[in-house]
Amino acid sequence: MLNQVSNTLLTPSNLSTQTLLNIFDIMSHRNIDYADLYFQLSQDESWVLEDGIIKEGSFHIDRGVGVRAVSGEKTGFAYADQINLASLQQCAEAVKGIAQVKQGNLISPSAFNVVNPIARYAAINPLESLTKEKKIELLHLVDRTARAEDHRVTKVSASLSSVYEEVLIMATDGTLAADIRPLVRLSISVLVEENGKRERGSCGSGGRFGLDWFFEVVDGDIRAVLFAKEAVRQALVNLSAVAAPAGLMPVVLGAGWPGVLLHEAVGHGLEGDFNRKESSLFTGKIGEQVTSPLCTIVDDGTIENRRGSLTIDDEGVPSQCNVLIKDGILQGYMQDKMNARLMGVSTTGNGRRESYAHLPMPRMTNTYMLAGQSQFDDLIASVKQGIYAPHFGGGQVDITSGKFVFSTSEAYLIEKGKITKPVKGATLIGSGIEVMQKISMVADKSELDLGIGVCGKEGQSVPVGVGQPALKIDEITVGGTN
């Protein structure tokens, strides 16, 4: 893989390992702790269907290099959208300005150590996994399926995207690493209407594999067909929904995608930069009980073919499974190289960046809660009056206070231990640690989301995974309209 990526990114400009060592030498007489080069090629393609016709098709290709130098807590960063010696030299001259001139102690490595991690996905180009005709056929199949599912379907929108990336990382700590990253996603949105009332449903999936995955047959149906039917089902549920109640009440969260609440309310607060700056609710709490003892939460970038998985992170560190909270006790934070060094701990393979034009920072990969021991039916049976929320929409969280607001996209009343009427307009309002300490039951099956997650932080978006088993929160504020 290293040879293939080098041939793509370096060979066309006659760049060699020795040439790149010389780039580090430009910065070597400054008081710099660490420096790295991040080369990237990306190709992305998307198709959009609306009203039964292809409304949009796009293709974009980009390549460039980011140059970073770190001195203490200061970072110098420059990037170029051309990969050549002159651009690298200009970037290196720019970033070294963050540090004082010093004598000796060159930071430039004498040689690189090639990182040979376990591959977490196949090194394929998903743009080439289906012909243009088959990609369009897939979107039309989704459209036909959704419309045939129910006469109340009035509008179907679907998008199909695929991304191919090659990255190469070189650093003054001797790191030399490369990765080839495929990524695909199918997104479906359906609008239904009855007696003047309109509601929407959505579904989607994806991961690090080829587009042909959507044509595979599972449980007697093509995957894309199943996703289209699920979008219609969700829309029809909301069409018959009544107004959600409001107030303090028990809530049962479904398995899988509702883990997005965990991601936002807990996950971001466990990223190393927030804790180094003491701006997280979890700062200084390692070894303390921060959630219910029923909760064990991990961030695992090693799961094969998952959207949030990485063979290496964007600093060349192999991904790993990090236990963040075990039996309710905080174990540690997610780290990149800079924050790990400043905090005196090891990096965890969580250094991520949107592209060569962005700085790396601690980010999640696939963050989820492990299974418990309760049966799902027992969770529902234990609630006299409350809400069951199997699907979430958007949400937001304040990292410092831990307070969050999340809207449900599908929810039901629980009455006398049984799931009854669907409800609309339910929002969950609370504080991360407080809510996590009120988890009293955790189901015995954990699920990951379908592969649609995108996480934003400081203007950067990266693909992520979330997940959890179904779980019961004894008391949380539900914002509703009734």
From Swiss-Prot:
A GO CC term attached to the entry: cytosol
GO molecular function ontology, one term from the record: metallopeptidase activity
EC number, UniProt record: 3.4.-.-
Pfam family, one: PmbA_TldD_1st
GO biological process, one term: proteolysis
UniProtKB keywords: Hydrolase, Metalloprotease, Protease
Domain of life: Bacteria
Residues in the signal sequence: none
Family: Belongs to the peptidase U62 family.
Function of the molecule: Probable metalloprotease.
The protein's name: Metalloprotease TldD homolog
